[in-house]
């Protein structure tokens, strides 16, 4: 009976088809892209992309955390890590002062590799992100020699309009609530979207939708700088 009512095979088929279309279109835009079946394959793939001795910076990303790349790098003990958003076991910043985090964030631009997620990726091969501080999207488009972007298949959308709709009406409210619940950030908890789940295009001082960046590919001379690993699981927000 269960075999007739579960949708595991159908979900796998649906996500794989969309992922392969997305990978093909990213590659047409001079972005390296690869589809892997699960987080375990993603971890192996990314670790193979990071040579010993290079400096790795991390952008704030649930997907990077869920795949477990940073603990694996720490265990390997062969790479310097830059993470302005590093937190302790209670979810609090290791660097509580904003000037400390700003200084470390600037160091990200000289990293050899930047590890990060993306808010959405379109079927026609565009990466869409909305950021609060701007450090994450800035390093994606300029600075580090190589960018490795990890993304779950749940973030594949039809086009830029659908991406922005998803970000403003799902990703942003969820992220604001996450920062409130898991990182004790009362300022984010007071945002309208964190209270109601609905975006009202607010002008709150702590609004997290500040910088919108759409990556439509890279110039041929930058081919291979951006590397997308699409994972056949629902990851991140």
Where are these predicted regions, by residue range?
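Amphipathic coiled-coil/heptad-repeat helices and related helical stalk/stem segments
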Residues: 100-101, 133
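N-terminal active-site beta-alpha-beta segment that forms phosphate/nucleotide-binding
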Residues: 15, 19-98, 105, 110-114
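SAM-dependent methyltransferases
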Residues: 1-29, 34, 54, 95, ...
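Short N-terminal helix-initiation segments at or just after the protein's N-terminus
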Residues: 1-3, 87-97, 171, 175
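Conserved phosphate- and dinucleotide-binding cores of soluble alpha/beta proteins
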Residues: 107-237
């Amino acid at each position: 009976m269960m075999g007739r009512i579960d949708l595991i095979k159908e979900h796998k088929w649906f996500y794989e088809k969309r992922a392969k279309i997305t990978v093909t279109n990213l590659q047409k835009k001079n972005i390296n892209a690869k589809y892997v079946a699960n987080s375990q394959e993603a971890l192996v793939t990314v670790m193979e992309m990071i040579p010993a001795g290079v400096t790795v910076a991390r952008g704030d990303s649930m997907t990077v955390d869920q795949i477990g790349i940073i603990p694996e790098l720490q265990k390997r003990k062969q790479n310097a890590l830059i993470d302005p958003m590093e937190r302790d076991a209670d979810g609090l910043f290791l660097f509580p002062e904003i000037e400390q985090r700003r200084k470390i964030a600037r160091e990200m631009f000289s990293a050899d590799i930047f590890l990060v997620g993306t808010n959405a990726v379109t079927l026609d091969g565009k990466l869409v992100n909305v950021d609060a501080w701007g450090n994450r999207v800035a390093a994606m488009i300029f600075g580090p020699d190589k960018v490795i972007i990890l993304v779950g298949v749940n973030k594949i959308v039809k086009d830029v309009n659908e991406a922005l709709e998803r970000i403003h009406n799902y990703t942003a409210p969820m992220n604001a609530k996450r920062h409130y619940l898991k990182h004790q950030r009362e300022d984010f908890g007071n945002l309208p979207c964190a209270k109601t789940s609905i975006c009202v295009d607010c002008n709150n001082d702590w609004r997290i939708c500040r910088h919108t960046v759409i990556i439509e590919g890279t110039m041929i001379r930058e081919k291979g700088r951006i590397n997308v690993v699409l994972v056949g699981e629902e990851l991140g927000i």
